[in-house]
């Protein structure tokens, strides 16, 4: 009797997990929560912007990110996925001049990686089941150029403390836009 009950519970949990993983509502909730945590971690990194104003740079985030127009769920998820991959790559650069707490940076990277992994799983499931065509997905090329400008800036400034402070603020802006895109993940 107990084994039968345990089997039913296990099957129910497996089914629930699969059903939930397909839900963009759940993805939106998890994404919002994780993005908030990333923003919190970024604020904990030291660096006073007022000392670095001379190093300011307009990285020119793609207009489709700043003012998204009727994204489909899949488009928003793919855009967020690509943004997070690039954010992860940026924070894997030389951070030695920042004086940042390594634990905070590691937590940030772990959180971003977790978001990427979760998005990848959901997207793979969706893409397998549906005939997917990219609608208003922000061009990968636009995003690559944008993040390329950030990486070039860091390199040109020799990964200085002020350069990282400016980039940290830019990545905080990214999470604002990611949260905006997350609104398109509702079922």
From Swiss-Prot:
Residues making up the signal peptide according to the UniProt record: 1-21
The keyword Glycoprotein appears for this protein: yes
Location relative to the cell: Secreted
GO BP terms: defense response to virus; immune response; negative regulation of Lewy body formation; neuron cellular homeostasis; positive regulation of autophagy
Disulfide bonds: 52-162
Pfam families per the UniProt record, alphabetical: Interferon (PF00143)
Annotated glycosylation sites: 101
GO molecular function, one term: cytokine receptor binding
Annotated GO CC locations: extracellular space
Assigned keywords, A-Z: Antiviral defense, Cytokine, Disulfide bond, Glycoprotein, Phosphoprotein, Secreted, Signal
Phosphotyrosine PTM positions: 24
Chief location: secreted
PROSITE patterns reported in the protein's UniProt record: INTERFERON_A_B_D
Function: Type I interferon cytokine that plays a key role in the innate immune response to infection, developing tumors and other inflammatory stimuli. Signals via binding to high-affinity (IFNAR2) and low-affinity (IFNAR1) heterodimeric receptor, activating the canonical Jak-STAT signaling pathway resulting in transcriptional activation or repression of interferon-regulated genes that encode the effectors of the interferon response, such as antiviral proteins, regulators of cell proliferation and differentiation, and immunoregulatory proteins.
Complex and partners: Monomer.
Family according to the record: Belongs to the alpha/beta interferon family.
Protein name: Interferon beta
Protein's organism: Macaca fascicularis
Lineage: Eukaryota, Metazoa, Chordata, Craniata, Vertebrata
């Amino acid at each position: 009797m107990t084994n039968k009950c345990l089997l039913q519970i296990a099957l129910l949990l497996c089914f629930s997990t699969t059903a939930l993983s397909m839900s963009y509502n759940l993805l939106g909730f998890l994404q919002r929560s994780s993005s908030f945590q990333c923003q919190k971690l970024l604020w904990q990194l030291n660096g006073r912007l007022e000392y670095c104003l001379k190093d300011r740079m307009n990285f020119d985030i793609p207009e489709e990110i700043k003012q998204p127009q009727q994204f489909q769920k899949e488009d928003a998820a793919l855009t967020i996925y690509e943004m997070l991959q690039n954010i992860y790559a940026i924070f894997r650069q030389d951070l030695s001049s920042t004086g940042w707490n390594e634990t905070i940076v590691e937590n940030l990277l772990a959180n971003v990686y977790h978001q990427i992994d979760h998005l990848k799983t959901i997207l793979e499931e969706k893409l397998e089941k549906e005939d997917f065509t990219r609608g208003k997905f922000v061009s990968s090329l636009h995003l690559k150029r944008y993040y390329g400008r950030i990486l070039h800036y860091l390199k040109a400034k020799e990964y200085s403390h002020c350069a990282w402070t400016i980039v940290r603020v830019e990545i905080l802006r990214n999470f604002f836009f990611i949260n905006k895109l997350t609104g398109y993940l509702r079922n």
